[in-house]
A protein has these predicted regions:
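Acidic, glycine/proline-rich low-complexity segments that act as flexible tails and inter-domain linkers
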Residues: 1-48, 98-135
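Iron-sulfur (Fe-S) cluster-binding segments and ferredoxin-like electron-carrier domains
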Residues: 27, 66-81, 107
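Amphipathic alpha-helical segments within well-ordered protein domains
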Residues: 33-34, 51, 68-72, 86
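Immediate flanking context of iron-sulfur cluster ligation sites
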Residues: 41-58, 79-88, 118
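Short cysteine clusters
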Residues: 60-63
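Short Fe-S-cluster ligation motifs
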Residues: 86-103
Length: 135
């Protein structure tokens, strides 16, 4: 298991516990996530790249892992991720020289796990594991 996959795995159980403790808030977040990340004027891949940049600027390792994985699943290329991360560097300065490479390494990790797609023009369901309210 790679470093970023381990970040996601480490968050899985604590997230389940918190989701059970505050199901309404988590259900609301899941709805917000689904609405914000669906294809629209911007496709889901572009939105995942935007989220990855935001994760770098916010210095959120868990967010970086989730959105790097989702960007890989959406078919983002290394060139697209590198270009997006240059915007993070512009907006965040020095700290992005640490978090940007983490994000790029996470993307590369998940790209290695990405199965070959028969039709690269078709989007894949995003890899973000949005915790939804448990009944």
């Amino acid at each position: 298991m790679g470093t970023s996959e381990q970040v996601i795995a480490d968050l899985r159980e604590p997230t389940r516990v918190l989701r059970r403790a505050a199901p309404g808030a988590w259900a609301g977040f899941a709805t917000l996530h689904d609405e914000a990340m669906k294809d629209g004027a911007l496709d889901a891949k572009v939105k995942e790249l935007m989220a990855l940049v935001a994760a770098v600027v916010k210095h959120c390792d868990g967010c970086i892992a989730y959105h790097a994985k989702a960007a890989a699943r959406q078919g983002a290329t290394s060139e697209e991720v590198a270009e997006a991360l240059s915007v993070a560097l512009l907006m965040d300065g020095g700290p992005s020289t640490t978090y940007g490479p983490r994000a790029f390494a996470a993307f590369e990790e998940f790209t290695q796990q990405r199965p070959a797609r028969e039709d690269p023009g078709q989007p894949v369901a995003d890899g973000h594991e949005v915790p939804v309210a448990a009944s």
